[in-house]
């Protein structure tokens, strides 16, 4: 049974500006694993990666109905990738099935999350 659906759309320019203003921004949003993955990418792909992960975490928080805040932090949600390239979410202390889709364009990143019991 579907218990939550969330979607998020972010402009790459907003993420790029946040990163330029605050070089520690990725560390606030990404887990250590995600930061290591981002560091392996070419500079032009790093903003896409960061924006995609940002959108995925926002979409998950919306699907949970909590948002990012006191009960759910950026670091509680980790985005990993299967060998096929399909992204998936790892969440601390959560037994629900989570489906994730992330997409990028030249100007935007978007993510959709569906949570099932």
Swiss-Prot record:
<dbReference type="Pfam" id="PF01648">
    <property type="entry name" value="ACPS"/>
</dbReference>
<keyword id="KW-0443">Lipid metabolism</keyword>
<protein>
    <recommendedName>
        <fullName>Holo-[acyl-carrier-protein] synthase</fullName>
        <ecNumber>2.7.8.7</ecNumber>
    </recommendedName>
</protein>
<dbReference type="GO" id="GO:0019878">
    <property type="term" value="P:lysine biosynthetic process via aminoadipic acid"/>
</dbReference>
<keyword id="KW-0479">Metal-binding</keyword>
<comment type="function">
    <text>Transfers the 4'-phosphopantetheine moiety from coenzyme A to a Ser of acyl-carrier-protein.</text>
</comment>
<dbReference type="GO" id="GO:0008897">
    <property type="term" value="F:holo-[acyl-carrier-protein] synthase activity"/>
</dbReference>
<keyword id="KW-0963">Cytoplasm</keyword>
<keyword id="KW-0808">Transferase</keyword>
<comment type="similarity">
    <text>Belongs to the P-Pant transferase superfamily. AcpS family.</text>
</comment>
<dbReference type="InterPro" id="IPR037143">
    <property type="entry name" value="4-PPantetheinyl_Trfase_dom_sf"/>
</dbReference>
<dbReference type="InterPro" id="IPR050559">
    <property type="entry name" value="P-Pant_transferase_sf"/>
</dbReference>
<dbReference type="InterPro" id="IPR004568">
    <property type="entry name" value="Ppantetheine-prot_Trfase_dom"/>
</dbReference>
<dbReference type="InterPro" id="IPR002582">
    <property type="entry name" value="ACPS"/>
</dbReference>
<dbReference type="GO" id="GO:0006633">
    <property type="term" value="P:fatty acid biosynthetic process"/>
</dbReference>
<dbReference type="InterPro" id="IPR008278">
    <property type="entry name" value="4-PPantetheinyl_Trfase_dom"/>
</dbReference>
<feature type="binding site">
    <location>
        <position position="58"/>
    </location>
    <ligand>
        <name>Mg(2+)</name>
    </ligand>
</feature>
<feature type="binding site">
    <location>
        <position position="8"/>
    </location>
    <ligand>
        <name>Mg(2+)</name>
    </ligand>
</feature>
<keyword id="KW-0276">Fatty acid metabolism</keyword>
<keyword id="KW-0275">Fatty acid biosynthesis</keyword>
<keyword id="KW-0460">Magnesium</keyword>
<dbReference type="GO" id="GO:0000287">
    <property type="term" value="F:magnesium ion binding"/>
</dbReference>
<dbReference type="GO" id="GO:0005829">
    <property type="term" value="C:cytosol"/>
</dbReference>
<keyword id="KW-0444">Lipid biosynthesis</keyword>
